[in-house]
Amino acid sequence: GTASTIDEVAAKEATRKLLEELVSNAESIDEMEEILSNKFDESSSEDIIIQYFGYYIYEHLDKWFYEHLIKKNNQSDCNNLFRQIKDFIFESLKDTQRVNSLQNLDWGSDEADRLIKNIQQDILTVFE
């Protein structure tokens, strides 16, 4: 249904953004491979999971949310606001990670859905 399409779009965009963040400076496939290899050596997989799901949740914020914020703010304020929201999402996930491992979370489960909805609600509360 529509929810799985939204999930798929959000997942693809999260993957694209994470890869762009990790390897945007690579000038060849070999360099890309080296950067990724080094990244996985120096970062725990938890850091990468937090980045991925941070982008996923950011992409998952529904259209209403964006429209709601844009109506209340001008465009340049919105760009700054979206940057703050993204940081807020990453920090929320890091806090969650300290209590419950995100590695073991089934992102298709009700628990994950609650986590996403709670973060969205927190964003509305903090940024309205």
Which stretches of residues belong to each language-model region?
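Long amphipathic alpha-helical segments with strong coiled-coil/leucine-zipper propensity
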Residues: 1-52
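Alpha-helix boundary/N-cap detector
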Residues: 6, 10-14, 44, 48, ...
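Short alpha-helix boundary/capping elements
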Residues: 19-27, 53, 57-61, 65, ...
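Extended amphipathic alpha-helical scaffold segments
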Residues: 37-56, 60-73
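Alpha-helical oligomerization segments
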Residues: 63-128
